[in-house]
């Protein structure tokens, strides 16, 4: 997937995964009651930040599925798709399948 957003420093661009539409028992959750997703696929990664004159690379790669902070990042929409630009510090974990 080609994204027209190029993150700077230790920022990453994530495409949020869809929120659950139904509960485990089959009840439909209305849009107004759904929680914001906290899981998404990394679609672009910045080069890393500088610390003491050395570039520190970002720990995630394009294609990784990550769990991120609930209130982290900035929502942007481009090409009809919504993305989230996060600092690498807002990523809590990489989902290993």
Curated annotation (Swiss-Prot):
It is found in: Cytoplasm. GO terms for molecular function: ATP binding; metal ion binding; protein folding chaperone; protein-folding chaperone binding; unfolded protein binding. Gene3D superfamilies: GroES chaperonin. Coiled coil: none annotated. InterPro entries: Chaperonin_GroES, Chaperonin_GroES_sf, Chaprnonin_Cpn10_CS, GroES-like_sf. GO terms for biological process: chaperone cofactor-dependent protein refolding. Pfam families: Cpn10. Keywords: Chaperone, Cytoplasm. Its main location: cytoplasm. GO terms for cellular component: cytoplasm. HAMAP family: CH10. Heptamer of 7 subunits arranged in a ring. Interacts with the chaperonin GroEL. NCBIfam families: PRK00364.1-6, PRK00364.2-2, PRK00364.2-4, PRK00364.2-5. Belongs to the GroES chaperonin family. Together with the chaperonin GroEL, plays an essential role in assisting protein folding. The GroEL-GroES system forms a nano-cage that allows encapsulation of the non-native substrate proteins and provides a physical environment optimized to promote and accelerate protein folding. GroES binds to the apical surface of the GroEL ring, thereby capping the opening of the GroEL channel. This is Co-chaperonin GroES. It comes from Arthrobacter sp. (strain FB24). The lineage of its organism: Bacteria, Bacillati, Actinomycetota, Actinomycetes, Micrococcales. The gene is groES.
